[in-house]
A protein has these predicted regions:
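Alpha-helical transmembrane segments of multi-pass membrane proteins
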Residues: 1-9, 23-27, 39-43, 72-76, ...
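Transmembrane-lumen/periplasm boundary regions of multi-pass, lipid-linked membrane glycan transferases
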Residues: 34, 41, 48-177, 183-195, ...
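Membrane-interface transmembrane helices that cradle and orient dolichyl/undecaprenyl
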Residues: 7-25, 33, 55-57
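Catalytic lumenal/periplasmic loop and adjoining terminal transmembrane helix
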Residues: 86-89, 93-104, 193, 231-382
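Membrane-helix interface segments
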Residues: 17-25, 61, 65, 127, ...
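Hydrophobic/aromatic-rich transmembrane helices and adjacent perimembrane loops
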Residues: 1, 33-38, 42, 133-141, ...
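Transmembrane-helix signature of membrane-embedded glycosylation machinery that interfaces
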Residues: 8-11, 82, 217, 221
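Cytosolic-side transmembrane helix boundary signature
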Residues: 55-58, 212-236
């Protein structure tokens, strides 16, 4: 995401003034971006190509422009090759691998929980609307409104002005920002790319989206430039909004990552969509047991599924020996496991087909924006803390 932002910025600078220095800066950014993710190459080509097209439309394509274009293209390629030694051993094989892996992520045959449906990525693909729905569900409403408004305004300008829309830095920036998130998103929808954990694999779209939102805000500001009171009210509303969102992040720390926008019903959300994909709640659950379990007694813990098991064991493995020694881990099917504290990651319990605990079984819950990401519960015969 960060390198996408840098590539977008450098393409704006290169288009504004196509010098050798700016071409080299763009080449470095594009090379690093492509090395990080192969989709970064597509973003870099898109940004560079649009900057080139804009220069042609403005009839600013002189000899020095040609030199800058060659430096940018060859420099980006050279930077990518130097950063990617595997490419030198077998260029065709390596490029085939990264392109295939970008289209169909093969290093992780996991599962998705989407709209109450469990999707096994080892043999299924997400529906084409998976990414836009996840973006809509997890993007704050005001930011989403600004993105959609800016996208609509920019598209209208494109239809009206055709290639002339690429004239001028402000208009070009609006079109470039829109293109950098809309075109990749449409491509991923068409290919139904195999991704997991919401739209984490598509976070490179986030900065161009925010750039579109910022452009929309600037359009609103220009409309209100001569209206003192509305301008102040708008600035105050924006500040209040950011304060509310920041407060929400602080209050839900360290589980703020499980955010869903306010229009998403919290009733049964745990069984419809993923929350704690990375077992962050396990750490909080273990710390709660350490603090609240009877002193001087071993803390027996078990789990509901293999992914939660991995989270429990991985967390305990990182603890100092003295703290870790209090915990005794047990398999859920063993005799001792029947009296152990049971740690349950809600997302992984649903993916494994395990029922969520009844209210009278719950000792502790870790919540994010009103939804439970993790429980500690025990059978009736277990020792209560």
């Amino acid at each position: 995401m960060d390198l996408t932002a840098v590539v977008l910025w450098q393409s704006l600078r290169l288009r504004e003034k196509p010098t050798m220095g700016r071409a080299l800066c763009f080449a470095l950014a594009a090379g690093f971006c492509t090395n990080t993710r192969i989709i970064g190459g597509a973003v870099s080509v898109l940004c560079g190509g649009m900057a080139l097209l804009s220069l042609i439309v403005e009839k600013r394509f002189f000899r020095r422009t040609w030199r800058a274009v060659l430096v940018a293209a060859l420099g980006a390629l050279g930077c990518y090759v130097l950063l990617t030694p595997a490419l030198l051993r077998d260029p065709a094989g390596y490029l085939t691998y990264v392109l295939r892996n970008s289209y169909s992520f093969s290093r992780w045959n996991g599962t998705l929980l989407f709209c109450g449906r469990v999707i096994d990525l080892s043999w299924q693909r997400p529906p084409f609307y998976y990414l836009p729905v996840m973006i809509a569900l997890t993007m704050p409403l005001v930011q989403m409104g600004l993105i959609l408004a800016g996208g609509a305004l920019t598209l209208r300008r494109c239809f009206r002005q055709k290639l002339e829309v690429l004239r001028g830095q402000e208009s070009f920036a609006a079109v470039l920002s829109l293109s950098c998130w809309l075109l990749p998103l449409l491509g991923m929808m068409a290919m139904r790319v195999r991704v997991y954990n919401g739209w984490r694999h598509a976070y490179f779209l986030f900065f161009p989206m925010m750039a579109t939102a910022g452009w929309t805000l600037n359009r609103i500001r220009l409309r209100l430039v001569a209206k003192k009171l509305p301008r102040r009210l708008g600035a105050g509303a924006l500040a209040a909004l950011l304060a509310v969102q920041g407060t929400g992040l602080a209050l839900n720390h360290p589980f703020q990552f499980a955010y869903y926008q306010p229009l998403v019903s919290r009733d049964g959300l745990e069984q419809r969509h993923e929350l704690d994909y990375w077992n962050v709640g396990i750490q909080a659950a273990l710390e709660w047991l350490e603090e609240n379990a009877p002193a001087g007694q071993p803390i027996r813990v078990t789990w509901t599924d293999r992914r939660t098991r991995s989270g429990v064991l991985s967390n305990l493995a990182l603890w100092p020996g003295e703290r870790r020694a209090r915990f005794v881990t047990m398999e859920p099917d063993s005799e001792e496991g029947a009296s152990a504290y049971r740690i349950l990651n809600t997302s992984y319990a649903v993916l494994a087909g395990e029922p969520l605990p009844a209210e009278n079984e719950i000792l502790y819950r870790a919540e994010s924006y009103g939804s439970a990401v993790c429980f500690i519960c025990v059978p009736k015969e277990a020792v209560q803390p």
